[in-house]
Each structure stands twice: as C-alpha cells, then as structure tokens.
Amino acid sequence: MQKIVRNRLIKIILCFCSTCLGISIILYNLEKNIIFFFPPSKINEAEQGKELRVGGLVKRDSINRISANKISFVITDNIKDLEILYQGVLPALFREGQGIIAIGQLSDNKFIARQLLAKHDENYRPPS
C-alpha cells in the first residue's frame, strides 16, 4: 500500500513539474508578442535599437510622398505624434484617419518602417 501511494505521489509531482516547465517555455517564447504594439505616447518605454511595432491613426494632412514608393506620414494616439518613414508598397486600406501598425526601428525621433499593416474597423457590413 505504501509503495502505491509513493508511486502515485511521484507521478503527480512529475506531472506538475512538467506542466510548469511547459508553461514557462511558452511564456518565454511569447515574451516579445505579449505587447503587440506601442502607441506613440509610450514609444519611450520600448527598448532602443530593437525592432518595434508602433500603432496609431494616420494624422490628417500628414501624408507626404517623397518619391514613387517612398512616403512619410505622422501617426497619433491623440496624445503624441510620431513621424513614420516607409519605402515600399502601401497596404490597400492605408489612408488618413485609418489605424495602422508599423514594424521597424526608431532613429532620431523618426520611425523607419520596414512593414506597414493597415487595420480595418470592427464593423461588419454585408455586401449590398
């Protein structure tokens, strides 16, 4: 009887330790994805020199086309503004007042984006 209880206890402890180890590995690997993006007002909290995601609304009258595929614009969270420089093809949903997420690095108070993601609104409208 004593041997059965001890074996059961060992199995329970091993299962508990395995579960804790698995959860720890998952959380460690998801660490940089826990905060999906920083708004312009919180960009100072992000690590400098690392790739970041910043998100906000494209400010009205801020889009400036530098060349055919190079653009600068300002995003805002209605607290602080941040200038974004991007070279590449713009997403189809990109426009003033639209929510976007830019992936890139911060350099001299300007954000150099390597990728833009346009956010659509949450309201579903069936085709008419």
Curated annotation (Swiss-Prot):
Tell me yes or no: is Signal among this UniProt entry's keywords: no
The superkingdom of the source organism is: Bacteria
Q: Which SUPFAM superfamilies match?
A: Heme chaperone CcmE
Task: Please describe what this protein does.
Answer: Heme chaperone required for the biogenesis of c-type cytochromes. Transiently binds heme delivered by CcmC and transfers the heme to apo-cytochromes in a process facilitated by CcmF and CcmH.
Residue ranges crossing the lipid bilayer per the database entry:
9-29
Cytoplasmic membrane side: 1-8
Specify the protein's topology with respect to the membrane: Single-pass type II membrane protein
Amino-acid positions noted as binding heme in the UniProt annotation, renumbered to this chain = 120, 124
Q: Which GO terms describe its biological process?
A: cytochrome complex assembly
Look up the signal peptide feature and give its range. Answer: none
**NCBIfam families, per the entry:** PRK13254.1-1
Write down what this protein is called.
Cytochrome c-type biogenesis protein CcmE
InterPro entries in UniProt: CcmE, CcmE-like_sf, NA-bd_OB-fold
Q: Which family does it belong to?
A: Belongs to the CcmE/CycJ family.
